[in-house]
Amino acid sequence: MSDDLTRVEKPWGYELHWAKTDRYVGKVIHINAGHALSLQYHNKKDETIMLWSGKLLFEIQQEGELQKHEVKPGERFHVTPGTVHRMTAIEDCDVVEVSTPELDDVVRLEDRYGRSDAKK
């Protein structure tokens, strides 16, 4: 495991990768207020997120429908492969994510920053 923190700049904020092995990854996702990650799913990546600070709107596919949850610090969600989801910051927020190591496994369905083939 690397001892270095890796900061990855994103159009919506940044990620701090604090652990990375061949079996898991740990990161803090900082989302600036009013910004959102893409509406996405993963083919293999399995992740659990927990809101550490701020206020977050979390959309997740449940029973075939996209459900919206206003999340408070300490609340968490398990996102299994194939589950459509998106995080939008109501306030500046920090999300702790622990996942399997497939960091490039992102299928974007909508993206306000024009990344990939996603709709804006």
Region locations from a protein language model:
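Glycine- and acidic-residue-biased ligand/ion/polar-headgroup-sensing regions
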Residues: 44-62
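A short glycine-rich, His/Asp/Glu-containing loop-to-beta-strand
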Residues: 4-45
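Short, surface-exposed secondary-structure edge patches
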Residues: 28, 48, 67-69
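Short acidic-glycine-tyrosine-enriched beta hairpin
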Residues: 62-82
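Double-stranded beta-helix
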Residues: 3-10, 88-120
